[in-house]
Amino acid sequence: MAKHIVELTDALSNKIAAGEVVERPASVVKELVENAIDAGSTVIDILVEEAGLNKITIIDNGSGIEEEDVATAFLRHATSKIKNEADLFRVHTLGFRGEALPSIASVSHLSMETSTGETKGTTISLEGGKIMEQKSGHARKGTQIEVSQLFFNTPARLKYLKSLPTELGNITDILNRLALAHPDISFRFSHNGKPLLQTNGNGDLRQVIAAIYGVSIARKSIPVKAESLDFNISGYAVLPEVNRSNRNYISTIINGRFIKNFALVKAIQEGYHTLLPIGRFPIIVLQIEMDPIIVDVNVHPAKLEVRLSKEKELGQLISQMIKEAFHQLQLIPDGEVSKKQKEQQKSEQIQMSFEENKLPKETPTLFSKPNVPEYVPSDEDTSREDDFILETLPTYDSKIQPEQAEEPKERIPKMYPIGQMHATYIFAQNENGLYIIDQHAAQERIKYEFYREKIGEVSRELQELLVPIVLEFPTDEYVRLEEQKTKLEEVGVFLENFGQNSFIIRAHPTWFPKNQEEEMLREIIDEALSAPSISIHKLREDTAIMMSCKKSIKANHYLTMQDMEALLDTLREASDPFTCPHGRPVIIQYSTYELEKMFKRVM
């Protein structure tokens, strides 16, 4: 017998909605803080006990709620943020579904005090979504919400929560992102009475970066900016020498909303291309403003994922912006490696939330900077801390002046070789100090830029083979190469069908290494076969990297003084001479001052 279809009760519907909206304590914090932001708050206090499982309290100084609207706020899909269908396509607020408050209330004990500041305040208490008490009373302007006994009526949900440190890390991560997205709001977050995050809300994004990641990271950041007809991008990109083992430090913010978008992350990585070692990722914060009509935030209840109608154009703008910003800088890292950096490279399993909540000790930087003592904020001294950070962070101007554009500054200075160490590293000097150059990485960069340019012009420089090369392949690879023939021709591999599962090659680019033509051709074909589908841009890039790596001088190769001098002079002509195509550093510098300090000649 078929079962009857019945309408679910509001209580059950709210619990189902809570399963999507309220996954863990961090979800509660996110929804309530976003409501506070939408209410126009300038100061938001977040007080958490036992990673939110015991109690979560959010206090803001926003617009508050009228007394007659307080009970309505806990009804499903009741909201003040949109009125009609047209508003759904021009969402200017972080919340708009009207699901957060009823969903949170349905799985917790919740109390709220709110006032618009014009009339008496209102207090309301709910348990499991049911209103237990509502009364008028005195309250300051704004809203205070306290959530306790989370998931008391859905014990199965508690089984899926992680350890307290993990849940606290999730909360901290969300608050870090919200603080980065809204530097004009003061966030004050504490756990069990201990302050974990404090920002002053003065609108300076770099100060927020310092508060979250530490002053040393903020010092290593440069401003980036770009705009088009559709997009306005600003933010800070941290120098490539400071990187991480995961993508957690990439923050993309659209219209004040932190979002996750794979295409934009790929665009950021493309902007850092060849500047980062393989498997390493940048630290960057981008704030992107656009017309709400071209971004759809109504994709998922958590609103972390969005759809962009001009995603490709935005990605290209981001990549180009980052490349241009770093192209103006001299990216030679200091020779000294701090203990903290060593420990970071050994183990990076610490969540971004906990990494640098205290201001770290001074570490060597690429730029000159004032000496800054270690400083740990006290509970009473947050305003002084913010002033301290502001005063000690240098300002970088990433804009090129017209006169600078006419006479571009050398990317690396003239260096005079003085010897070779272990037949691998070149030692050079000038008036600025000592330079150590990885000879393989240096020539790899030079050859990479040469091949990258040549691979785009293969049709003009072809050499006929006296003896054509015949290559045989398994059926599956033969079929795939048939599909890739056009792309392969653009990188210098011209395949003609030659019998069953075979191709013949009659010519190759003139810049192929002599006596290694067949090896080179097979390497390029292997690159094309290594991925199910590959773009011509990626194939060219991978081919240039592969050829430069294989054809560069290796370690344990002795060079004459003339060879070293020629290599360094050629390196100075490279467009990006600071890293090899794999992102490893080419040059490390010890300034004269650092050397004199090591030998105690200066104090």
Curated annotation (Swiss-Prot):
One of its GO terms (cellular component) is mismatch repair complex. One of its GO terms (molecular function) is ATP-dependent DNA damage sensor activity. Transmembrane segments: none annotated. It comes from the Bacteria. Residues 336-355, 361-384 are annotated as: Disordered. Residues 336-346 have a biased composition (Basic and acidic residues). Keywords: DNA damage, DNA repair. GO terms for biological process: mismatch repair. The keyword Protein transport does not apply. Belongs to the DNA mismatch repair MutL/HexB family. This protein is involved in the repair of mismatches in DNA. It is required for dam-dependent methyl-directed DNA mismatch repair. May act as a 'molecular matchmaker', a protein that promotes the formation of a stable complex between two or more DNA-binding proteins in an ATP-dependent manner without itself being part of a final effector complex. This is DNA mismatch repair protein MutL. The lineage of its organism: Bacteria, Bacillati, Bacillota, Bacilli, Bacillales.
